[in-house]
Curated annotation (Swiss-Prot):
CDD domains associated with the record: RecA-like_FtsH (cd19501)
Complex formation: Heterohexamers with FTSH1, FTSH2 and FTSH5. May also form homooligomers.
UniProt topological domain (Lumenal, thylakoid) ranges: 38-161
Cofactor annotation comment: Binds 1 zinc ion per subunit.
Name under which the protein is recorded: ATP-dependent zinc metalloprotease FTSH 8, chloroplastic
Species name: Arabidopsis thaliana (Mouse-ear cress)
GO cellular component, one term: thylakoid
Length: 685
């Protein structure tokens, strides 16, 4: 009897016949079906075969099953049908003598039974029976019926060694390949910034290169920093016409360091020089040099300057250089600190043995105090340009630049806005006009009015406007608190003038008193500083005098923080106390956390006690003056509070007019009515 075989991998069944004839398909010749052996032990099968071999086995099994389903059992036309049979039906067939042969697998738990099926016209049916176990009773019954039965061991398919090797390696190769593709995609290898050579390109510079920079910014767009702009215009002129300078022996500056607080236009100046110079321009952030891999930062510095030298003359702009140029030798990370290696390479490239002729490095930072001294020396950064907050003229010029695309009502004056915004940076002024435009659009206006400008200034300085308080003790307390600030400030010689008093909450403050700061905030006298302490304590003094010492509230917490810091500065920084003209800044005053940890406090215990005593003396003296002014002007305070509770906002002119009816304002604190349109500095509760 010829045979063909198929394998059922799922249930461990092997079907063996001798030959197949595809008569129903109209085929005249016989064909043999490839024999596929399968292990009946699933755990061993999964452990020995790989993913690729499993797919091949399943495909072959499917072909075998299709072939065997249409085959005849033998040449006499006796068919074989494959199916399952329950154990109870198997016992019934056994009792009736219909069982011809039994093959036992899996330690007697699976039986392949050849039985005569009446449903198939007494043809032999080959079925699979799940046995509860190989019992002695079943064996005795098989012997009694003289049935041919045999037990078989599980057969292992050793297969081809090459296929087994491929199967074993398929999953690890697919896993590693998938991880590699994911790393390339996340690092830019699939079209991102990393490039197709990742990770080989990890040491290459990430600087953005522009052969013909088109930043959309020129020197005409930069205002309020005339000194810095002049320095950059000289650099641009040197790049365009170097012969004018080399004829008299001048050399081009190797580096320009921009130093200033945030928002003053350092990056804007870099964009302007890129748009004006007409030479290749490289731009990169200091944080892009340092990675988690050792040596990457130094490698990127080398690659950056290599590209720059190939395109010289050119400009390299490093934004936030303090990320890589921090002072060395702090002991943090030791001598192998990655940042120090990167900085060492940067120092070498800027002014080392080889030099970098034709490459101008422009860097920006707002933390020049923590930069390494070797980085700041001439030859590396020949010029240090200070970009501070603009003065009145600078603010006016900046407002003209940012107001070009905005519509204003006829009563709006940019000069007045500039006067009202001392201490505002260029970014603050741009944000101010943008907020005013948003408010105008929200209110359905076609042009920006002074009302939107006022509200925008209040919003930027003090925060969002809150819900107005309802009448009651809390509102009355806030009113007395704010009027206390205003009265003590107005009656103390040297204090800033009151701009307005309001009970409209903004941010965390439930009420605000706005003052007009001095024209030059960089030069402040001892009298002015002490007057600010008195004015700051006026709110707490008003609460104590009006409501009693036991009714003072936490509303003065921010005032106390400000006046304590100001008094400490007068003693330790400005030398304005009985201790003498000493600068006594301790380690806690250091701006950098590492320097703060490394700094040694050389102050003696007695000197520290003297400082605390001097600070307390200043505060106590100021508080006594504030209490005296509140007690002596109780009638004026009650009148002003009554009007303020009704109107909720009072201008500085109106406040001074009412106060002058009850007491005399010091001559130096008297202001003209027009000044009330100047800038606010809030004192809040």
């Amino acid at each position: 009897m010829a045979a063909s075989s198929a394998c059922l991998l799922g249930n461990g069944l092997s079907v063996y016949t001798t030959k197949q004839r595809f008569q129903k398909l109209g085929l005249d010749r016989t064909s043999k079906v490839t024999v596929v052996k399968a292990s009946l032990d699933e755990k061993k099968h999964e452990g020995r075969r790989g993913f690729f071999k499993l797919l091949l086995g399943n495909a072959a099994a499917g072909v075998g099953l299709l072939a065997s389903g249409n085959a005849n059992a033998d040449e006499q036309g006796q068919g074989v049908s494959s199916s399952r049979m329950s154990y109870s039906r198997f016992l019934e067939y056994l009792d009736k003598g219909r069982v011809e042969k039994v093959d036992l697998y899996e330690n007697g738990t699976i039986a392949i039974v050849e039985a005569v099926s009446p449903e198939l016209g007494n043809r032999i049916q080959r079925v699979r029976v799940q046995l509860p176990g190989l019992s002695q009773e079943l064996l005795q019954k098989l012997r009694a019926k003289n049935i041919d039965f045999a037990a078989h061991n599980a057969q292992e398919d050793q297969g081809s060694p090459i296929l087994n090797l491929i199967g074993n390696l398929a999953f690890p190769v697919i896993l590693i390949g998938g991880l590699f593709l994911l790393s390339r995609r996340s690092s830019g290898g699939m079209g991102g910034p990393g490039g197709p050579g990742f990770p080989l390109q990890i040491g290459q510079s990430k600087a953005k290169f522009q052969m013909e920079p088109n930043t959309g910014v020129t020197f005409d767009d930069v205002a309020g920093v005339d000194e810095a702009k002049q320095d950059f215009m000289e650099v641009v002129e040197f790049l365009k016409k170097p012969e004018r300078f080399t004829a008299v022996g001048a050399r081009i500056p190797k580096g320009v360091l921009l130093v200033g607080p945030p928002g003053t236009g350092k990056t804007l100046l870099a964009k302007a020089i890129a748009g004006e110079a007409g030479v290749p321009f490289f731009s990169i952030s200091g944080s892009e040099f340092v990675e988690m891999f050792v040596g990457v930062g130094a490698s990127r510095v080398r690659d950056l300057f290599k590209k720059a030298k190939e395109n010289a003359p050119c400009i390299v702009f490093v934004d936030e250089i303090d990320a890589v140029g921090r002072q060395r030798g702090t002991g943090i990370g030791g001598g192998n600190d990655e940042r120090e290696q990167t900085l060492n390479q940067l120092l070498t490239e800027m002014d080392g043995f080889e030099g970098n002729t034709g490459v101008i490095v422009v860097a920006a930072t707002n933390r020049a105090d923590i930069l390494d001294s070797a980085l700041l020396r001439p030859g590396r950064f020949d010029r240090q340009v200070s970009v501070d907050v603009p003065d009145v003229k600078g603010r006016t010029d900046i407002l003209k630049v940012h107001s070009g695309n905005k519509k204003f009502e006829s009563g709006v004056s940019l000069e007045v806005i500039a006067m009202r915004t001392p201490g505002f940076s260029g970014a603050d002024l741009a944000n101010l006009l943008n907020e005013a435009a948003i408010l105008a659009g929200r209110r359905g206006k076609t042009a920006i009015s002074s009302k939107e400008i006022d509200d925008s200034i209040d919003r930027i300085v003090a925060g969002m406007e809150g819900t107005v308080m309802t009448d009651g003790k809390s509102k009355s307390l806030v009113a007395y608190h704010e009027v206390g600030h205003a009265i003590c400030g107005t009656l103390t010689p040297g204090h800033d003038a009151v701009q307005k008093v309001t009970l409209i909450p903004r941010g965390q403050a439930r009420g605000l008193t706005w003052f007009i700061p001095s024209d030059d905030p960089t030069l402040i006298s001892k009298q002015q500083l002490f007057a600010r302490i008195v004015g700051g304590l006026g709110g707490r003094a008003a609460e104590e005098v009006i409501f009693g010492e036991s009714e003072v509230t936490t509303g003065a917490v921010s005032d106390l923080q400000q006046i304590t810091g100001l008094a400490k500065q007068m003693v330790t920084t400005f030398g304005m106390s009985e201790i003498g003209p000493w600068s006594l800044m301790d380690s806690s005053e250091q701006s950098d956390v590492i320097m703060r940890m490394m700094a040694r406090n050389s102050m003696s215990e007695k000197l520290a006690n003297d400082i605390d005593t001097a600070v307390k003396t200043l505060s106590d003296k100021a508080y006594e003056i504030a209490l005296s002014q509140i007690r002596n002007n109780r009638e004026a305070m009650d009148k002003i509070v009554e009007i303020l509770l009704e109107k909720e906002t009072m201008s500085g002119d109106e406040f001074r007019a009412i106060l002058s009816e009850f007491t005399e304002i010091p001559p130096e604190n008297r202001v003209a009515s027009s000044t009330s349109t100047s800038t606010p500095t809030p004192a809040s509760v």
